[in-house]
């Protein structure tokens, strides 16, 4: 009876953290927000909110979810694993019982998988020439990133997390425009794309923004 609520609560902090990073991306890369607004206007219109029934028809929003998880993983060193037997990797001996951390941050920036400019927030990297969601690289099993982990200890709530991010992003962009704040002189307040605090998750530090009705 407790499994579902605990699973939901367990994923709330990471989803909240991801939404914070995504909103920062909307401030830093307004062209991606404009493209998402255009897709929502064309598919959903202004008479109703987006729903999960729109999921197949919103490839850019779905790509935006993948890119947010790729761009700023909330667990940049993944979940610890332990080797079950002695092993060798590239000349290095790994004894049985060794605690292993995966550098998800670095893996998500592999240019051979993700192309150039992996530091930039670019949902289009997940789209094909026709604008549909492209098939994923086999190494990441269509997830589009390494942020959900590997093997038997990958994220059990990854599908729920994807769905939560999709509907939150779609509804928020349908309803609002996310804009940078200005100081008293009319200049944009600076953005720190690398500002973060460690609270167990990789959480964005404070920043300022405006939400305007879309």
Where do the protein language model's features map onto the residues?
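C-terminal domain-closing interface element
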Residues: 61-70, 199-214
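Cytochrome P450 I-helix active-site segment
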Residues: 25-75, 84, 90, 95-98, ...
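A structural signal for well-ordered alpha-helical segments within the folded catalytic domains
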Residues: 17, 59-63, 142-146, 162-171
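Conserved cytochrome P450 K-helix/beta-meander segment immediately N-terminal to the heme-binding cysteine loop
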Residues: 102-135
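Cytochrome P450 heme-thiolate "Cys pocket" and heme-binding signature region
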Residues: 5, 10, 53, 90, ...
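Active-site proximal loops enriched in glycine and acidic residues that flank catalytic Cys/His/Asp
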Residues: 80, 103-104, 125, 149-150, ...
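Cytochrome P450 heme-binding "Cys pocket" and the immediately downstream C-terminal segment
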Residues: 30-33, 140, 158-202
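Central I-helix of cytochrome P450 enzymes
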Residues: 1-39, 68, 99-103, 153, ...
């Amino acid at each position: 009876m407790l499994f579902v609520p605990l699973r939901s609560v367990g994923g709330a902090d990471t989803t909240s953290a991801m939404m914070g990073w995504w909103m920062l991306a909307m401030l830093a890369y307004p062209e991606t927000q404009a493209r998402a607004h255009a897709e929502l206007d064309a598919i959903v219109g202004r008479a109703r909110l987006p729903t999960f029934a729109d999921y197949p028809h919103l490839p850019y929003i779905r790509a935006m979810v993948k890119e947010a998880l790729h761009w700023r993983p909330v667990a940049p060193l993944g979940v610890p694993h332990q080797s079950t037997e002695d092993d060798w990797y590239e000349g290095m001996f790994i004894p049985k019982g060794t605690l292993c951390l995966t550098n998800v941050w670095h893996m998500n920036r592999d240019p051979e998988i993700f192309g150039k400019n992996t530091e930039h927030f670019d949902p289009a990297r997940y789209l094909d020439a026709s604008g549909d969601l492209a098939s994923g690289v086999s190494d990441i099993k269509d997830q589009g990133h390494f942020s959900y982990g590997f093997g038997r200890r990958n994220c059990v709530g990854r599908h729920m997390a994807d769905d939560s991010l999709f509907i939150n992003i779609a509804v928020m962009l349908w309803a609002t425009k996310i804009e940078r704040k200005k100081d008293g002189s009319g200049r944009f307040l600076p953005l720190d794309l690398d500002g973060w605090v460690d609270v167990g998750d990789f959480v964005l530090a404070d920043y300022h923004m405006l939400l305007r009705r879309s």
